[in-house]
Amino acid sequence: MSAILGLALGLLLSGCSQSPSTPKYDPDLIFGYDKTLPLSPQETPAEETADYRVIKVTYRSARDQRVPALLILPKQPREEKLPCVILMHGLGSDKRMFQMLWGALTKAGYALFAIDAQYHGERKPSDDIPFFGMYPYRARDALIQTVIDLRRAVDYLQTRKEIDPDRIGYIGASMGGIIGAMFAGVDERVKAPILLVAGGDWKILMEKSTLSMWRDAARNNPQQMQEALRVMDVVDPVHWVGRIAPRPVLFINGDADDVVPVESNKALHNAAGEPKKVVWYKGGHVPPPTDWLTVVGEVTNWLNTHLQGKPTARGWRDYLPRLGSWRAFTEWLALAAPAVAAFFREFAATVYGYLSPRTQ
């Protein structure tokens, strides 16, 4: 009898272990690729500044894609290997979206790597079909392709003698944050990802986002929306973000975001494991100017803590005592503010360019 009870208990516990923590999809079937496929990188020196030098890179990815990318290295060579941050742009932008921050990050001792997502930048098709909207299979496949492209980017970075393969971070904004939740979820080589203004749950996004390409498709054809939800479920980041744990993840979101709605933000946060940090600023999809430096402070502190082991100040108010004087602070602000402002202006222009009605 005890043996039967023991067997029953074992089966019960086994059944419990297959509950919500069990992955809904097999990551290798969705985001797997041939790891021995040659990268065949092509590298061309590009621009240089006083702080950094840029190398144009293309490399082979899955499905015979060649991925255009930029490797940004500090101008002055360093003896130690560098931590590298992969930068992923938002919808409608390209690999130069974070360019205004390249100088500050390379001066802080980081290498950077940025790619064009599928159907963006150098990979943008001439017919300009919207990334999201009436073609859910196309959108799904593009997101999967971009995640694989990012995994191949890590493969490439691990071949570079300047890069520390154990200190690869990630910053993704908006669509780049959604992609990053999947990428970091299926690739353990990514440390401490930062997901900016990202969200999950495609149903919330399609029904409540102010992006016209989703809203109009949902309103004009409810059956089409249901089909889109079925197709896109495999690339819903809520299924993948929990796999980031036990690596830490930072979320930064606006409490009045109507592009990636707050309900969608919280769905992604709730699906993530621990440790995680959630930072809210007061504003929409683009932080208001009053919070720009605070957001940058959070990002900088997170990178320095988890990739360099030396935390810095949390926000712009915390820089004042560290800099030692008001004059030193204003000098720092004069250098930092233009780059920060330029970045968020470009981000805002990209976002609101997609808010206007467009042909589906």
Give residue ranges: language-model regions:
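Gly/Ser-rich "nucleophile elbow"/oxyanion-hole loop immediately N-terminal to the catalytic nucleophile
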Residues: 131-174
